[in-house]
A protein has these predicted regions:
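Cys/His-clustered metal-coordination modules, chiefly Zn-binding fingers
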Residues: 129-207
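Short helix-coil boundary/hinge micro-motifs
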Residues: 1-163
């Protein structure tokens, strides 16, 4: 007798920024020492669990499952990181006004085809949410909300507002929702102030 392996999760619609937040889990990409937030599968699951739209899917990949299926767990993690890098390159192309590379476009489309399907809307405390059928033991299924976010960003008007931080060592991606469309920094308190301090140093230490 066969059993249905799929379960249903209730997931809110992901913000378009979610995919960029995922890409930004590797920080200081332009520096000599990039900072990796997702060094292990538990790191990935912990990050997903902190995202309201992905928490339910992250809970399906447990430590016990990873111990029982170590090769699948390693493959899932490697595929997730590869998807992160494809999303980052797509974002960088948008920020630069370039065409998204066909390899990255194909990788995103292939992952979307394997993502947990949205079966319809349900009512929840916030109003409405997606009913998602999932068996999240693949990177595409696990990252479904991130992938939907990336697809919505590429297909929507906000693709023209994707920027990369003007700090060449940072390279974080963000959607510029400022009225003037002139935001330069991922965070003014961090990269913006650092750039101001560097300019001040150069002005006051000219030989």
């Amino acid at each position: 007798m066969s059993t249905n392996q799929h379960r249903t999760a209730v997931i809110g619609a992901p913000a378009e920024d979610l995919c960029l937040d995922f890409a930004n889990t590797l920080s200081w990409r332009g520096s000599a020492t990039p900072s990796e937030s997702l060094a292990t599968l538990p790191d990935l699951l912990s990050w997903l669990a902190r995202q309201a739209q992905a928490e339910a899917l992250a809970a399906t990949v447990t430590a016990a499952w990873a111990e029982r299926h170590p090769k699948r767990a390693v493959r899932l993690f490697a595929e997730a990181i590869a998807l992160r890098e494809a999303v980052f390159r797509c974002g960088m192309a948008l920020a630069s006004g370039d065409i998204v590379a066909e390899t990255d476009f194909a990788a995103l489309n292939q992952a979307l085809a394997g993502a947990s399907p949205r079966r319809g809307l349900v009512r929840d405390a916030a109003g409405f949410a997606w009913a998602v059928e999932h068996e999240a033991h693949s990177a595409a299924a696990l990252l479904a909300p991130v992938l939907w976010s990336a697809a919505d960003l590429l297909a929507g008007a906000d693709r023209l507002r994707v920027r990369r931080c003007a700090n060449d060592e940072c390279l974080w991606l963000f959607v510029d929702r400022s009225k003037t469309g002139s935001r330069r920094w991922c965070d003014m308190a961090a990269c913006g102030n650092r750039a101001k301090a560097q300019r001040h140093y150069r002005r006051t230490h000219v030989s």
